[in-house]
Every structure is written in C-alpha cells, then in structure tokens.
Amino acid sequence: MTVLIHVLGSDIPHHNRTVLRFFNDALAATSEHAREFMVVGKDDGLSDSCPALSVQFFPGKKSLAEAVIAKAKANRQQRFFFHGQFNPTLWLALLSGGIKPSQFFWHIWGADLYELSSGLRYKLFYPLRRLAQKRVGCVFATRGDLSFFAKTHPKVRGELLYFPTRMDPSLNTMANDRQREGKMTILVGNSGDRSNDHIAALRAVHQQFGDTVKVVVPMGYPPNNEAYIEEVRQAGLELFSEENLQILSEKLEFDAYLALLRQCDLGYFIFARQQGIGTLCLLIQAGIPCVLNRENPFWQDMTEQHLPVLFTTDDLNEDIVREAQRQLASVDKNTIAFFSPNYLQGWQRVLAIAAGEVA
C-alpha cells in the first residue's frame, strides 16, 4: 500500500509546528501513514525535534504545489492529507484533474472554509474554490464546520475531527479550586490577527459591562503588528480606563499564556467563523465560559458536549457569567471530545480513512 502523504501547504509556523509535533509524539509510532510530510516554510529545527517524521520543506506555496501535483500524476494510488488549505494552486489542480478526488483528503481549518477576504483577487478565486471543494474525497472538521460545509457541498463525505490543541489533561480539575469574585477580567480575542475584530469586540464588551471590568487583549501574534496594536490600544482607551485595559504586545510562552487565561472570568470572541479553538479549549479547561458570535458554528460542538454557551447578542451581566461558570464547573472535562487526549481517537480513524484502510 502507498503511504499517505501529509501536506501543510502554507507557511503558518505556529500551526505547522503544532501539527508536526503532534504527529511525531502521538501518531507516528503506531501508523506508517502518520510519518510523511511536505511543508511550506523553513526547517528551523523541526526535523531535529520530530525525528519520527520524514519532512520535506519547500520555499513557497507554488513549489510545494508543483511537487504534490507531480506525485499525484505519477501515481494515482497516492493519497494526500491536506491540513488546512491556503494554497490556490492545489485547489486549481483538484478542479482541473491534476489531483483526483480519490487522492484529496482535507482537514478544514476555520479560516480557509469561510469567504471573508474582501480583496478582488480573493473575490475572483472563491467561486473556483467552491467548485473544487465539490471534488474533495472527504473532509474532516468540527461539527459546526461540517454543518456549514454540507450546506453547499452535501454530497461530499465529512468526518468529525478536532485540531490537536496542546493541553495537559491533568489540569482538567484545576479550575474547581479557584474562587471567582470581585471585578471580572475578560479576555478579548485569541491573537492580534485582525480577524478578531478587536475594536468592535471592545465596544461590545463596554456596551455590556461599561468600565467596570478589566479587559485583556493578547496581541503578541502575528509579528510586526505594531500599527494595528496601537490602533486597538487607542480605541480601547476611549472606552476603558488605563487600569482596566491590558494590551499584550509581546508573544507569551505557553505556560505564561496559560497562567494569563486562568486569571480571566470570561472569554469574548466576536468573530463570525470557527477559529481560536485552542484558546477556547484552554479557557473551558480552566472553567472559564466563552461568549461567541451566533454565526460561529463552533457553538454546535460546545452544546453537543453539554457546555454552556453565551452569545454576543445576549444581555450579559455578572450574575449570568457566574452562573455559566457554575454550570461549567459541573461538567466532567475528561469526557469533552475536543480535549486531549480524546481527540486522538478521531485522528486514528481519519488516518485510516484517508489511507484507504477503512471505508
């Protein structure tokens, strides 16, 4: 049997590193279909830190796409597992037959499913991408994203799968020991990316709570984002006193980020698509409820796991937040499907599907 090849078709270092390390640590030892990778970006020590994997790096999207297409044409039994899919050349290859549907298995990452970019180049490309998506052999995604995708592509097979968020299962019960009282701290957004719509989110928080809460805005990623960070800071200071606004402009190490999240009482995410699942998982693990946009389909995954969900359209106050905290504290977090290690079973299943080992 031909070994499955995994493709990380865009240079997104933090996600690519997470995926490679997850496969190296959790999957490669038990499946030959979890070892071969083609990646856009620099090695930067990844090969050394992932010795169980065979990783080929490419300088750009086009060079990787050309190599994938060549392999697909040379052997029509060769199957590819695309992690996220921000590579237009690969979509066009699927549409034109360079890559066959039986070779194309796609793990949907939030941003590459939704058509939110306003640039003309993207607007022109989206219709072609929709046509190509009809030809995908199978998609893997969250429950909400599967539902969203099925509305336009009902004939494409879909299987439930969660991004491998870095988590320590031993912390699942830690939140129950913490007493929450006094001024609330609200986390706004999961990064400095503009998709978080920070200014609108800050205005929404202020409308609900006024200047009675402390707002923390993590903006240490992506790099070279100083102008936007300052824009958010100025908008925030028009709404909140300086002591109630904390803009984090430096990237935090994981343990420091975890400690920051555990000081919060509420997460507030205004984006209208699935993103930031890693941050949501860490907040839920810490017993901290989240406010989501009703257009963000991840609420379906949360309710399926019997987790309380608050919406940006709800009338929120401290009593409602504290009640959501109490509800969350009563949930057995060891049973949540999108938590580690529970998502591992899903990965083992989809690897077998993509490799053709199971129907």
Swiss-Prot record:
Keywords for the protein's UniProt record, in alphabetical order: Cell inner membrane, Cell membrane, Glycosyltransferase, Membrane, Transferase
GO annotation terms (biological process): enterobacterial common antigen biosynthetic process; fucosylation
Pathway in which the depicted protein is active: Bacterial outer membrane biogenesis; enterobacterial common antigen biosynthesis
Broad class of enzyme this protein falls into: transferase
Location(s), subcellular: Cell inner membrane
Main location: membrane
Protein origin, superkingdom: Bacteria
Molecular function via GO: 4-acetamido-4,6-dideoxy-D-galactose transferase activity; fucosyltransferase activity
Membrane-related topology note: Peripheral membrane protein
Reaction(s) the record says it catalyses: beta-D-ManNAcA-(1->4)-alpha-D-GlcNAc-di-trans,octa-cis-undecaprenyl diphosphate + dTDP-4-acetamido-4,6-dideoxy-alpha-D-galactose = alpha-D-FucNAc4-(1->4)-beta-D-ManNAcA-(1->4)-D-GlcNAc-undecaprenyl diphosphate + dTDP + H(+)
EC number: 2.4.1.325
NCBIfam families: PRK02797.1-1, PRK02797.1-2, PRK02797.1-3
Name of the protein in its database record: TDP-N-acetylfucosamine:lipid II N-acetylfucosaminyltransferase
Species, as recorded: Shigella boydii serotype 4 (strain Sb227)
Gene symbol of the encoding locus: wecF
